[in-house]
Structure formats: C-alpha cells, structure tokens
Amino acid sequence: MAAIVDQIRLENKKSIIRLVAGDITERAVDAIVNAANSYLKHGGGVADAIVRKGGEIIQEESDKIGFVPVGCSVITTSGRLP
C-alpha cells in the first residue's frame, strides 16, 4: 500500500506535489516522468516496470518516436496503467 511521505504546496497555491512510497505503476496519476536513454529502450529499472505493467504499446510508441536528445522529453500514452 502506498503512503504519502511528504508534500508541498507550490507558490500558486493551486498545485500540490506529493512524495509517495509505493509502486508507481499502481497509482492513478496525471503523469509519470521517467528518466530514459536516448533510444527509449525500456529494458530495465523503472522504465521496464512501466512497460511490463502498462503493456508493450508503450515500447512500440517509443520505438516510433526514435532518438531523443539528452534534455528533451516525449509523451506516450499510459497503455494499461491506471
């Protein structure tokens, strides 16, 4: 079971960031931000867990995107994630 470890309210007073302990693939969230290699090959760590739980569609979408320079970001669907 996930538990909130800490949280902060941003200066705009409309946003809250929560630090939560638990399985990131089981949380209903707006987005997951995950560090990845430039070729978007999700073969280990958090990236692998996301693809295993969310489905191969996440890797397939990443393959279509291809190379991503360091410091840039991309968006995929969540697959079967909540």
Question: Language-model segments: which ranges?
Answer:
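Macrodomain-like recognition of ADP-ribose-binding/processing modules
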Residues: M1-P82
